[in-house]
Amino acid sequence: TTGNATDFGDLPRVTTEAGGFASATRGFTAGGYNPSYLNNINFVIFSSSGGSNDFGDMTERTWGTNCLANSTRGIIMGGRAHTDDNPYNGGYMDRILFVEMASGGQDASFFGDLLRPQEIGLTAGQTGTLTGATYASTTRGIVAGGGTPRTKVIQFITIATKGNAQNFGELTQEASRVTGFSSPTRGLSAGGFNNTPSSTKSNVIEFVTIATLG
């Protein structure tokens, strides 16, 4: 149906820059910022109105995490980790974490590492991702593109098994701050900033077939 949004409930605190992922029955937020870095994982039950509930914690206080999920496992990738309470002074995370969404609650566990630098402001030797597009099938999770220096690189993981991200292919252009969404078979990246010239806003929509490499 069409119509305006209706109030569902509240987060435990005012939060910006949190990651989000979901199963068929639960929605999750991970990390965020206000007034400092957060490591909370919270969840709501879609079928009931009300506020969010505490699920567990991430290994680091992090904002800007890229998140995705299949039907059972939620994945938390990258982000900017706490070094002090300035949101732009943190280090860049290459870590991938996971939770089992149907559990009664648990802290995130280590899954693997991302491939390469992907966040605005990275310097040589830093790794992480904050601004790529994410999408998933029942078996694979993908993060595409990312920050400065902007990249075309698309990375993937196999959600059911632990391990580092692997190279999937490339976008048609370098892109950061990209929106990602998917069906069970096809992942799309939309908009963002590209390098034609530097920091040009984009209206480009690209797609990949998630089950293939390329």
How does the language model describe each region?
Residues 1-214:
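Polar, enzyme-active/binding microenvironments
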